[in-house]
Amino acid sequence: MKFILVDTSVWSMAFRKKRLEADEQKLLEFLISLIRKRHVIMIGPIRQEILSGISDTNKFIQLRDDLESFSDFEISTIDYEMAAEFYNRCRSKGVQGSQIDYLICSVARNNNFSILTLDKDFQNYKKYVDIDIIDESEWLN
């Protein structure tokens, strides 16, 4: 299996949600499996998104410490340039997205990573950007 860039939506489900639905529990187990196999990739912008909005200092510190297990994959100038290209391409087709989402797409594309996400926006990006998104069938079974 190749390396997986895990999107903020998955991390948020794993770290913040108290009660998981059956499909979310399967996704959590899949994520744990990827972590154990050392297939998970982290980038700084995802780390920032995960940590943003946590007003409780103790919870912030605990989550920050938990995430220290994952070093940040280095983002290159080419990644930033391609993210801008993806943004422009998708926007011209009427698809809106965040700058960080397009950066995730770019880093994944440039480094042959798959993306694990719960964010349906990535399906819209995939129509115009060559990215590999892990299908639910891979973790629901």
Task: Give the positions of each predicted feature.
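Structured helix-beta-strand junction loops
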Residues: R36-R38, D66-F70, K93, N111, ...
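A generic structural signal for short hydrophobic patches within well-formed alpha-helices
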Residues: W11, R47-I50, F122-Q123
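Short loop->beta-strand "edge-of-pocket" segments that line small-molecule binding or catalytic clefts
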Residues: I4, H39-M42, E68-E74, S114
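Short, well-structured N-terminal submotif of metal-dependent ribonuclease cores
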Residues: M1-M42, S52-R64, W139-N141
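A general structural signal for well-ordered alpha-helical segments in protein cores
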Residues: L28, R47, F60-L63, Y80-A83, ...
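Active-site neighborhoods of divalent-metal-dependent phosphate/nucleic-acid chemistry enzymes
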Residues: D72-L118
